[in-house]
Amino acid sequence: MIDIKLIRENPDLIKGDLIKRGELEKLRWIDEILELDKKWRENLKEINNLRRERNKLAIEIGKRKKSGEAIDELIKKSDNIAKRIEEIEKENNIIREKIDYYLWRLPNITHESVPIGKDDTENVPIRFWGKARVWEGHLETFLEQSQGKMKYETITWKPELHADLLPKIGGADLERAAKVSGARFFYLLNELVILDLSLIRFALDKLIEKGFIPVIPPYMVRKYVEEGVTSFGDFEDVIYKIEGEDLYLIPTSEHPLAGMHSNEILDGHNLPILYAGVSPCFRKEAGTAGKDTKGIFRVHQFHKVEQFVYARPEESWEWHEKLLQNAEEIFQALEIPYRIVNICTGDLGYAAAKKYDIEAWMSAQGKFREVVSCSNCTEWQARRLNIRFRDKPNEKPRFVHTLNSTAIATSRAIVAIIENFQEEDGTVKIPKALWPYTGFKEILPVDKREKCCQS
């Protein structure tokens, strides 16, 4: 939520940012907010004047009572003032509701470094890491996507898509999952179960080393939390509601972690607060019909380790870079080649002031795909959830800044491992960093092994 004081003092800044985001239909909202706010403040001034007048009448009534003078006329006048105050307060409540309607639906103000663009095609790659394995048939598109800034080795055989390789390594059963639950669900099997759990523990260990507190949050939250952390459009497109309950399945542990300190005033000396959330994530994936219909890349349910930070406003941009660095270190340790993308205004989402994505190179698909999202939401979520801090007991509280970033989303990391570490015979090598966690170094095709998890 945006501070109405900022709209009041600098409406052109807000309008300019809405134009950058392509939210042109909301420009008139700013003018309406200003008109409503002006009327609200005029009413408030009148209420205060009427209260002062009524207080004077109360004093006069007291004096006349003592002297035995008539007070009926003064009491009548006082009652009329009280009624007028009540009328204006009701009007102001209606005005406040209208203002809040707009404020709750305005996006965050973007950082000056966010590129202006209409959609994901105008996101800007800013950094590349690793050495990609590139099938010769994908070389031209790879060079275009990597801008010639990434190391690579060419392979002559075409890697299999993860969806095609999954049954060959006994990694998942999507057909039976579709029978039981519908599309975009999966049974994870054999080594991939161990790999999934290993990725969680690996990422968690990395974050614990950096001072993050591990948290398994509630998997359902109340509506006020969802309204506080995300845009209203997500209620239709992303979030599952529990029928008959004021509860929603979490699409990411970011949401319960943001709600964890709602309506609290934090001790500034304890900032930053660093949480590493571990949870399943549940997403409708509405609006993605036809996209990634095979395999486990875009699914309704998956596991994720999430970084979440409550920071001082003056430190939040530094923490944004640190969260990105943490995620990069995880993918570098896994030896998965990637690029960093600065998300443009048209693809940013309402909550974030700036967002980076890490996109892993998918050798079989021949393109980069999102595996990490790293956002600074500044005070947008904190205002909605009323999360403040102060350094001294009598100090006026300030809103914290909230930040979040994927550490690892296991299903997408598994896809990246399968596509980048497969051999021509269908064997999938395990990144060395995971060997102490998995207990095996490769996943053999089903027809080449006797049992699961052979080391």
From Swiss-Prot:
It catalyses: tRNA(Ser) + L-serine + ATP = L-seryl-tRNA(Ser) + AMP + diphosphate + H(+); tRNA(Sec) + L-serine + ATP = L-seryl-tRNA(Sec) + AMP + diphosphate + H(+). Its EC number is 6.1.1.11. L-serine binds at residues 252-254, 306, 406. Keywords: Aminoacyl-tRNA synthetase, ATP-binding, Cytoplasm, Ligase, Nucleotide-binding, Protein biosynthesis. InterPro entries: aa-tRNA-synt_IIb (IPR002314), aa-tRNA-synth_II (IPR006195), aa-tRNA-synth_II/BPL/LPL (IPR045864), Ser-tRNA-ligase_type_1 (IPR002317), Ser-tRNA-synth_1_N (IPR015866), SerRS_1_N_sf (IPR042103), SerRS_core (IPR033729), tRNA-bd_arm (IPR010978). ATP binds at residues 283-285, 299, 370-373. One of its GO terms (molecular function) is ATP binding. GO terms for biological process: selenocysteine biosynthetic process; seryl-tRNA aminoacylation. It is found in: Cytoplasm. Disulfide bonds: none annotated. GO terms for cellular component: cytoplasm. The keyword Nucleotide-binding applies. Its main location: cytoplasm. Pathway: Aminoacyl-tRNA biosynthesis; selenocysteinyl-tRNA(Sec) biosynthesis; L-seryl-tRNA(Sec) from L-serine and tRNA(Sec): step 1/1. It comes from the Archaea. Catalyzes the attachment of serine to tRNA(Ser). Is also able to aminoacylate tRNA(Sec) with serine, to form the misacylated tRNA L-seryl-tRNA(Sec), which will be further converted into selenocysteinyl-tRNA(Sec). Consists of two distinct domains, a catalytic core and a N-terminal extension that is involved in tRNA binding. Belongs to the class-II aminoacyl-tRNA synthetase family. Type-1 seryl-tRNA synthetase subfamily. Homodimer. The tRNA molecule binds across the dimer. HAMAP family: Ser_tRNA_synth_type1 (MF_00176). This is Serine--tRNA ligase.
